[in-house]
Amino acid sequence: MMFDEYIAARKQGKKEYKAKTAAGEYPYLPALESLVPDANRLVQYPLGLMEIPVGLIAGTKTQGRQNSFAPDFMPLLDENSEFALKWSSLYRAQISEGFRDPIKAYEYLHRFYVLEGNKRVSVSKALDIPTIMADVTRLMPTADVLAQNPAYAEFMKFYNVSRIYDIDCTWEGAYFEIAELMKLDLEHKWPEESRMALRSAYWRFSIVYRELSGKMPELPIGDAFVIYLRIFIRDALRDQPKNIVTRRVMSIRKEFMTEKNTERVGLVETSDEALTAGSLITKTGTIVSKMIPKLSYTAKNPLKAAFIYDDMTGDSSWTADHEKGRLRLEEAYGGVVATRSFEGCSEQSSFEEAVREAAEWGADAVFTTSPALINDTLRAAIEYKDIKFLNCSVNLAHQAVRTYYARMYEAKFLTGLIAGIEAAADGTHRIGYCSDYPIYGTIAGINAFAIGAAMTDPLVKVYLEWESRRDENWWWDMVDRGIHVMSAADSVHSADGSDAYGLCYVERCEPGEGNDLSETCRIRNLSAPIYKWGRLYEIIVRTIIDGSYNADLVDRKDQATNYWWGIDSGAVDIVLAEDLSGYTKQLVSVLRRDIVDGSFSPFDGELRSQEGLVRTQSDMPLTSGDIIMMDWLNENIIGEIPVIDALTDEAQVTVRYSGVGKTKRESQS
């Protein structure tokens, strides 16, 4: 009998009621008018008739019918009541023919609140029906509420182009990533085929994820779905059998665990930390190896490491530097390590072909040298589980892929010291600084440079430009301003063919044809911060050889591992011009030593941004995470962090994966 279903539903409702009461929480259905007292004064946008997810129905619009339901919409009134009779009648109607009329609901911050049809929602939840037809009106949050809920502001753009309500993500950037994975955007209406494919993929995933709830971390399904799409986008949009979806979801369980962890990235900040991870240190300081199996690599059976570049070594100084690092790695191990490189793998097809060749070659490790390759690297790591995959980036959280980067801000601080001395000596008190991409870690380098310059010239101003900005002609802009001290490209191997690299002094410059500055300018090189990728690769490979790569200290179970090494590990350093003053060299040497032994950081003491005070002298020091995530500029910097739309197409690819929040956020407003 249908009354039996009501009795069962009421039993569930009473259980929920008791649980909420015991927890000191409100035991009835939430009402929007109670949650948002000024709800009736908010701007209303009729969205019309649509199918909405029952799981996103959070309560009722008004306060009148709250006490009839528990918070989960299960009924509470006596089974002999008129309410129970009507509920059972609706149950029969749904079983036999379905509901004829849509409910009326208001949507606020991606949740629905019912004006008419509470019992129909209750019946739908009792029957575990995923969707229900509704006539929906959106209540537009106020500007301050939207500012506190950037993910919802982004969702509204997503809904406008996709007309999909089902996917509920909690973090900013998720909907932009979905659009990018779909090779679409949040500005133009999506084709019906794409819209239906994504919605179907989400429902296939959500059914499996709910069924595996006991084996999965408590991660919002929408957030988990984005991770799933990153890895399986090519097949996820097809109609896949449930067993295949289940197998794929289980294969990336660790990625879900990492996403759930509030401290998603675990930094390994010294080479010693990595190299002694598989050892015990006795009370006397003696290092004793743990029982970690060491692999026997020889010249006849070498460790094989593949390097995948998104660019060509002849076209990119960044790629050329990594290629030098690869060759240094081979040289350091004298035949015990063999390497191969694959250039020009920016497209998914060429990347996958490179990984396939590397796997057939027998690669033990694969290094991918651009943040833009992270998703391709992640997909490969899931497929080729016996190969260790590492990506050159910082603050990207994936269990299957380790990341590595250098603390370039340490060397930038030292070059800033020299720049300040030169700017004070020529009386201009001005320095030009050209950065590449506004990605994690880069802003710290800019600020450290500016702080170093201010320590030797308190009057100095640093003029910031971005090489990756569209139609940028930063060099001549600086020359026109009368700036002589410039921080240019970090590498000697300049893509533009000039000899303007590192920190330099422009003694004379006249406009000429082409980009070869050596023909039109007289430039004196002062110093250069340098990445020493060979040293970094040498240390990582050593951990693989001695077995410490998989030690618990480094191989965290619910965190991504990020090697972030500085001058003390030999991963970054500074080269000084021979004709620099001996006093300048001594100052740099002293502060370099203090950075290495940990007694000094460029970000000690009071810090002031363009907007005001960041840190007082007595505040806790900035954490490494704070330094990586910087999205502010020091007070003596003239310039800004560009929005993503102002960057070249090539730069936008990298910034979408690894850009600082300010860059991505402002472009979405």
Give, region by region, the residue ranges found by the protein language model.
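An alpha-beta-alpha
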Residues: 326, 414-457, 557-577
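Extracytoplasmic "Venus flytrap"
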Residues: 305-324, 329, 333, 342-348, ...
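Flexible loop/hinge segments that line or gate small-molecule binding clefts
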Residues: 382-405
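Periplasmic-binding protein-like
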Residues: 362-371, 390-392, 483-496, 527-531, ...
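A short, basic-hydrophobic beta/loop patch
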Residues: 97-113, 119-151
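Hydrophobic alpha-helical segments within soluble ligand-binding/sensing domains
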Residues: 405-427, 531-550
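Short, charged/polar connector segments at secondary-structure boundaries
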Residues: 1-111, 115-116, 126, 171-183, ...
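Segments of small-molecule ligand-sensing domains
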Residues: 546-669
